[in-house]
């Protein structure tokens, strides 16, 4: 009985970057945030990003966005295990970065389902439902009313 107890704990520890993955085909997922839609392809590799034909640093010069995107890979300690090819469309930089993060997290689960609890706890699997509120007629913006004069 003592031998069966440590066995489940061994795979729960995050695998190091030395572990290589053999996939019969690339993992494909979709991430969405605000108006942005990102199609992600995950293949075993060295940690290279190809975003619409450009590198991560070239496409997202903002360091905050770069950290946001790499966060799921850092959480499961697989930064240099995969190459990521993504087609980003719609929205702005912040929405695209959030959509890419969701797509990467979903792909990592398909590769190794044992990483799901760590990614779920970090909040990387939750689709952020916040979107721009629509403008209403009679108002200047979604909620801003024109100035009111009592007399």
UniProtKB/Swiss-Prot annotation:
PROSITE patterns to which the protein is assigned, alphabetical: RIBOSOMAL_S9
Question: InterPro entries of this UniProt entry?
Answer: Ribosomal_Su5_D2-typ_SF, Ribosomal_uS9, Ribosomal_uS9_bac/plastid, Ribosomal_uS9_CS, Ribsml_uS5_D2-typ_fold_subgr
Q: Which Pfam families match?
A: Ribosomal_S9
Q: MF terms per GO, please?
A: RNA binding; structural constituent of ribosome
So which domain of life are we looking at?
A: Bacteria
GO CC field? cytoplasm; plasma membrane; small ribosomal subunit
List the keywords (alphabetical).
Answer: Acetylation, Ribonucleoprotein, Ribosomal protein
Bias type Basic and acidic residues, positions: 127-136
N-acetylthreonine: modified positions: 2
Which intervals of the chain are annotated as region Disordered? 1-20, 121-151
Q: Does the keyword Ribosomal protein apply?
A: yes
Q: Which biological processes are named by the entry's GO terms?
A: translation
Bias-annotated ranges (Basic residues): 137-151
Q: Which SUPFAM superfamilies match?
A: Ribosomal protein S5 domain 2-like (SSF54211)
Regions of biased composition (Low complexity) lie at 1-19
User: Keyword Repressor on this protein?
Assistant: no
Please name the NCBIfam families in this protein's record. PRK00132.1
The entry assigns this protein to a family as follows: Belongs to the universal ribosomal protein uS9 family.
UniProt xrefs under PANTHER family: RIBOSOMAL PROTEIN S9 (PTHR21569), SMALL RIBOSOMAL SUBUNIT PROTEIN US9M (PTHR21569:SF1)
What is the recorded name of this protein?
Small ribosomal subunit protein uS9
